[in-house]
Every structure is written in structure tokens, then in C-alpha cells.
């Protein structure tokens, strides 16, 4: 496994790069926008393809690099379901997994620092964002923070992990880089409490100033969605009601760009072909499966994903490869369900033997 911990000295933010093998896919956690060039140089040097970029919560102390990384690499952006950002490609709930080749993280919903905070567990380590720091914890006095919720997140979820679990936080202000669950239980001064009320009293009396970039960072981080307003993309963006009129038409090929776990959790539009977003590029080049299917006389291709970001990016790529008879479902399956569109359970994949 490839693992790198990177540090932004301005915001004291830790960013993490993970990959299963040299030359494989990579995932980045909590990127800072000013460091994007560095984040892109490192995977290039290691022969990695950035597949996913993840934020543990909506940050108040720096502007996220999620949007810029997506624009420059076409990676999938990931956040928790509770994050009130305009658009991300994939949203996770408690217990869901985010996966790339050779790496799997389990999402833990840990509200308290914010109401959209998540931690991510991977084998022997946990990425705690701003929920649990080294000898400290994330503040709870803004962004719908809740000290009692933070107490439950820490004591009922994080501190129940194996004692040797490595703790990799989203920030550090003293030069520490890693801890363990056992160390934090024993030595973190904010965790030497007997109740949620006692913890809430500590947090209420911290008297911390607001983060310097808060008034800029929070609005920016709520608006990281892909700009699908180019005339070409806008003309090929269909609302859910319009798409429903095409359902069942042999001339329209519905293509689901989501991952298998999303399909199993949320269902599919009936009659959809499954082609995960990460596999799209090879399939729209000359000789590719989707390119061949799109070339059939009278055929149109309708792309959809969870919220419309992956499908808009895919639409751009299809147009760039000369496939003009394509469109996408604006707002993705989320908009489809809200409009009352039919959903079915996908058939399980069968293995030939």
C-alpha cells in the first residue's frame, strides 16, 4: 500500500493520499486548494491515477481542493449525505464504503464538530477529520456543532475501535503526526470526563476565536459542484419528467455510471446498462463498447449517476470523442426519485464457472 501524509502549514491541515499499489488508483482525503499542484505531482511521480477525492466535512478553516481536483483529473468527489454542498459525485451514509483498487474505507457518521462530520476506518487506522485530534478534539461552537453529539461520536464510535488503531487527524497545531486510540483514551485531556454534560461544559468554555478564513471558506466549500452551464452541456441536460418519457424506448440506451454499492443501496432505473464512471473513457474511444452501441442508427445515449456530476463530466468526454447523440439526467437518480420515477433492484452479478 502507498500512504502519504501531507501538511498545509497555513491552516495546519493534514491531507492523506492512499493507493493499493504503484501504478494503480489513488484516493485523497481533505485536500487544500492551495496544495493541488503538489497533490497532482505526487501521483504523477508514483504512476497513480487519482480516482476519488474525499472531504471529511465542510471545512471552515481552508478552501477545499475537491472541486479543483475534479476539474483537473475528472476524479469522483465524495462527502457524507448530511453535507449541504451543492453537488458532489458520491454521498455516503454511516457504514457505507468508499473504495478504490486495493483500498476500502468504512464511513462512520460522527456529528458534533459539524453536523456533517465523518471519520473513515481502514484496516489498522482511522482518519478522524476534526472529530478527534491528537490530545484534543474538534470545536463544537459553529456549523451546527453539538458538544453532546461529539461526545457520543467519540466515546460510542471512535473509542470502541481496537486500542492499537492508528489515529490520523485532520489537523495538528503542535507538530504531532499520529496517535492511537489507546493513547487518546489515556492522555487526551478532553476525554478524561465522566459524562456528556461534563464534556459539553469543557467545550462551552474554550472561548476560541473563529477560524480566520471562516467567512470565505464555508461559502466556497458549499459551492464546489461541477459547472454544467456550458451551452453544450445545458442543451443536453434533461429533467426527470422529460427522461421518464423516454423510459422503455428501444432507441434510448440508459447508462448508469454509479458504482455497484450505490446501485445495491439506492436501486436503478429499469432497463439500465451498468458502466461505472471510471470505466467510461476506455468504452467511448473508437472500438469501445459504448462507442459502438452509440453508433447504431437512431440510437441515443442517456447517462445518469447519483446527483448529476459524474454524468455531466462523462457527457463532456463523450462529446470530445465525437459522440454527439448523448444527454444526461440533470440531478441524477436523486432528482429521478424525487420526481416519482420508477426504481428497481438491480440483478446480482453472476460469475461464469
Model regions and ranges:
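Conserved beta-strand hairpin/beta-sheet module of binuclear metal-dependent hydrolase folds
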Residues: 1-49, 119-129, 135
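Active-site HxH/HxHxD metal-binding segment of metal-dependent hydrolases
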Residues: 12, 23-25, 33-109, 186, ...
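Catalytic cysteine-centered active loop of the rhodanese-like fold, especially the PTP/DSP P-loop
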Residues: 259, 275, 286-338
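Core dinuclear metal-dependent hydrolase active-site scaffold
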Residues: 5, 17, 97-122, 160
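Residue-level marker for buried hydrophobic side chains located in beta-strands
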Residues: 27, 52-54, 127-128, 168, ...
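Accessory terminal helices/loops
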Residues: 152-166, 170-241, 245-248, 252, ...
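Positively charged, proline/Ser/Thr-rich regional signature most characteristic
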Residues: 230-303, 346
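Active-site metal-binding loops of divalent metal-dependent hydrolases
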Residues: 31, 58, 82-83, 113-114, ...
Amino acid at each position: 500500500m502507498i500512504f502519504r501524509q501531507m501538511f498545509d502549514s497555513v491552516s495546519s491541515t493534514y491531507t492523506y493520499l492512499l493507493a493499493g499499489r504503484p501504478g494503480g488508483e489513488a484516493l485523497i482525503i481533505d485536500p487544500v486548494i492551495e496544495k493541488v499542484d503538489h497533490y497532482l505531482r505526487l501521483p504523477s511521480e508514483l504512476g497513480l491515477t487519482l480516482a476519488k477525492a474525499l472531504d471529511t466535512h465542510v471545512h471552515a478553516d481552508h478552501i477545499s481542493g475537491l472541486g479543483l481536483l475534479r476539474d483537473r483529473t475528472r476524479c469522483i468527489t465524495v462527502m457524507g449525505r448530511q453535507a449541504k454542498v451543492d453537488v458532489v459525485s458520491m454521498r455516503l451514509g454511516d457504514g457505507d464504503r468508499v473504495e478504490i483498487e486495493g483500498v476500502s474505507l468504512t464511513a462512520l457518521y460522527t456529528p458534533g464538530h459539524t453536523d456533517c462530520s465523518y471519520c473513515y476506518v481502514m484496516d489498522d487506522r482511522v482518519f478522524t477529520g476534526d472529530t478527534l485530534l491528537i490530545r484534543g478534539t474538534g470545536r463544537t461552537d459553529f456549523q451546527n456543532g453539538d458538544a453532546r453529539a461529539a461526545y457520543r461520536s467519540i466515546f460510542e464510535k471512535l473509542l470502541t475501535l481496537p486500542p492499537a488503531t492508528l489515529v490520523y487527524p485532520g489537523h495538528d497545531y503542535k507538530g504531532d503526526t499520529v496517535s492511537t486510540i489507546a493513547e487518546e483514551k489515556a492522555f487526551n485531556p478532553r476525554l478524561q470526563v465522566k459524562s456528556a454534560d461534563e464534556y459539553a461544559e469543557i467545550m462551552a468554555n474554550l472561548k476560541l476565536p473563529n477560524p480566520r478564513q471562516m467567512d470565505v471558506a464555508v461559502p466556497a466549500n458549499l459551492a464546489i459542484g461541477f459547472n454544467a452551464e456550458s451551452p453544450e452541456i445545458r442543451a443536453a441536460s434533461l429533467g426527470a419528467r422529460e427522461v421518464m418519457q423516454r423510459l422503455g424506448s428501444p432507441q434510448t440506451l440508459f447508462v448508469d455510471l454509479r458504482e455497484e454499492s450505490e446501485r445495491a443501496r439506492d436501486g436503478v432505473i429499469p432497463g439500465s446498462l451498468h458502466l461505472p464512471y471510471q470505466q467510461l473513457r476506455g468504452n467511448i474511444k473508437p472500438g469501445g463498447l459504448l462507442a459502438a452501441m452509440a453508433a447504431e442508427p437512431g440510437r441515443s445515449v442517456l447517462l445518469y449517476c447519483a446527483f448529476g456530476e459524474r454524468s455531466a463530466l462523462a457527457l463532456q468526454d463523450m462529446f470530445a470523442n465525437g459522440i454527439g447523440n448523448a444527454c444526461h439526467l440533470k440531478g441524477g437518480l436523486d432528482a429521478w426519485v424525487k420526481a416519482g420515477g420508477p426504481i428497481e433492484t438491480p440483478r446480482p452479478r453472476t460469475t461464469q464457472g
